[in-house]
């Protein structure tokens, strides 16, 4: 079981990859899951827009798309591919007054929370997602 990081025609490098993987393992455990094979693919805004159209039928930009490959039959191991648009993450960081790395960590944990079953489609579930992101970002600060 591993966390892997890839680039899809972009040059982003996530710092502290091992520490990030350990943090994500703790997040999954806190949510009642075990972290399995999870891949992060960093890509452009255009690439994620194309994927959003093709796979989800949405014609808009987004910062993250999570594909869940977890086997829910009797196991609590999560697995999946998490595609992150580094351009939109940087734009969002500026908009929200965060650093690019802080916003990237938020999006990274957001993907794992989706694998753990957290939805964000309604105002209520979106607020729950945001509270969990904040909680686990505090975990990160303790890891540093």
Go through the PLM ranges and name each one.
Residues 1-105, 115-144:
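An acidic/histidine-cluster motif and surrounding catalytic segment
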């Amino acid at each position: 079981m591993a966390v892997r990081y890839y680039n899809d025609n972009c040059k982003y490098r996530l710092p502290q990859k091992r520490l990030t993987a350990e943090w994500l393992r703790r997040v999954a455990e806190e949510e009642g899951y075990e972290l399995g094979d999870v891949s992060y693919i960093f890509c452009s805004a255009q690439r994620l827009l194309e994927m959003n159209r093709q796979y989800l039928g949405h014609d808009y930009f987004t910062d993250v798309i999570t594909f869940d490959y977890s086997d829910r039959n009797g196991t609590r191991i999560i697995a999946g591919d998490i595609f992150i648009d580094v351009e939109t993450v940087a734009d969002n960081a500026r908009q929200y007054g965060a650093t690019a790395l802080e916003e990237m960590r938020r999006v990274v944990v957001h993907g794992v929370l989706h694998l753990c079953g957290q939805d964000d489609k309604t105002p209520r579930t979106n607020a729950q997602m945001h509270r969990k992101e904040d909680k686990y970002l505090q975990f990160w600060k303790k890891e540093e």
